[in-house]
Amino acid sequence: MQICKVFLTQVKKLLFVSLLFCLIAQTCWLALVPYQRQLSLDSYFFRRSREVSSRYDFTRRRHMNQTLKLSSNTYNDEPLNKTKGIKNQRENATLLMLVRNWELSGALRSMRSLEDRFNKNYQYDWTFLNDVPFDQEFIEATTAMASGRTQYALIPAEDWNRPSWINETLFEEALQLMEEKNILYGGSKSYRNMCRFNSGFFFRQKILDPYDFYFRVEPDVEYFCDFPYDPFKVMRQNNKKYGFVITMYEYEDTIPSLWEAVEEYLEETESADIDMESNAFGFVSNFDFIGKSFGVIDSNSGYNLCHFWTNFEIGDLNFFRSEKYIRFFEYLDSKGGFYYERWGDAPVHSIAASLLLKKDEIIHFDELGYKHMPFGTCPSAYYLRLQQRCLCDSNHPDNIDLNVISCLRRWWKDGSGKYFLKHDS
């Protein structure tokens, strides 16, 4: 009897220990379930990440074996003596920046962005222009930031300063009037010098004589995406003379008499300069509605105010050096509108390109993401943004392309843009 009691006691203890073990095991299992799920999710997302990245391996690794400049940013973790391969062949081109000494930080930000996204793979020259001598700090900092050669030039006074034939009384009155109207840069004398210089003198600088193409860069801009190609090469191979990324409406208060001067020029000029059958004149003169939500901006002249935003432009210097462009500029310049009003280089370049070039000599670089305050542009194709590692959202309010103030749809219809819009009733 005593033996039975001992046996039952041992069985009870064993059952209790077993139940306790089961409870502990169940508790541990329940605690581990979220962790196991997390491991499963981590494994899934890791696998998907590898699938996406491997899809773009060629794009991501296409520049791993580039030969890079020793004295500057290499953008490469490997020692230079381990790099192998052949440099990308460069075109006869330069990156061009009109900049002042005090804008150094903004210049470096723009340079870093463009070097990261494009020039680290080509090492194009950087050319800097200023109306006063560059200081040593500016030269040293920009030289260190560039992957290619840097060069600096002082703009001659006769190319920059206000011409002597401008009536000073009328000029001062114009400054005061525009300042009272709160027109952007309406009271600035130096801004007018800059617009006139960029319209008719930048391409005459001796430092640019050796080059065929230029890429205009301004301080404090950003390039959102890796460049999928060399735009200079695209320009040369496809016989393009002018390239842009953003097009929008101009402020009419800055150019009230510009179109009148253009019309006078058209009446007086030789017809050989202009071919209305093949040019993009409709881009700057057409007022037709495009779609239900994209109308037109009111204008008091025959100019619809569309222009290419020239803070990003890639151009053929030989077009600007041509007699037909110089004749056009000098005629406009003789009217004094750069000073009595506030004509910008953007509408001047845009009207000139639309009149004097064939529409298929102008290219819209729609794969290039770009930001100049307050507007930007971002490629609309999702997989293109992935492939080019873009840091932008095509649906962001800052993306001007589908904004009502954008002229991109006008370019699609009246330039060398979208075929379906040209034939849409």
Swiss-Prot record:
- Cite a single Pfam family from the UniProt record: Glyco_transf_15
Query: Which segments cross the bilayer?
Result: 14-33
Asked if the Swiss-Prot or TrEMBL record annotates the protein with the keyword Glycoprotein, the reply is yes
Q: Which family does it belong to?
A: Belongs to the glycosyltransferase 15 family.
Broadest EC class assigned to this enzyme: transferase
* UniProt cross-references to SUPFAM superfamilies, sorted A to Z: Nucleotide-diphospho-sugar transferases
- Where does the source fall among the domains of life? Eukaryota
Topology term for the membrane: Single-pass type II membrane protein
InterPro entries, alphabetized: Glyco_trans_15 (IPR002685), Nucleotide-diphossugar_trans (IPR029044)
The name of this protein is Probable mannosyltransferase KTR2
**Lumenal side of membrane:** 34-425
Q: Name one GO molecular function term.
A: mannosyltransferase activity
- Where are the coiled-coil regions? none
Task: Give the CC-aspect GO terms.
Answer: Golgi apparatus; Golgi membrane
* Pathway assigned to this chain's UniProt record: Protein modification; protein glycosylation
Cytoplasmic topological domain? 1-13
Catalytic center residues: E313 (nucleophile)
Task: Extract the ranges annotated as region (Catalytic).
Answer: 90-425
Q: Where does the record say carbohydrate is attached?
A: N65, N81, N92, N167
Keyword Transmembrane helix in the entry? The reply is yes
Q: Tell me the segments the record calls region Stem region.
A: 34-89
Provide this UniProt record's keywords sorted from A to Z: Glycoprotein, Glycosyltransferase, Golgi apparatus, Membrane, Signal-anchor, Transferase, Transmembrane, Transmembrane helix
Which GO BP terms apply? Answer: cell wall mannoprotein biosynthetic process; protein N-linked glycosylation; protein O-linked glycosylation
Query: Which subcellular locations apply to this protein?
Result: Golgi apparatus membrane
Disulfide partners: none
Query: According to the UniProt entry, what is the EC number of this protein?
Result: 2.4.1.-
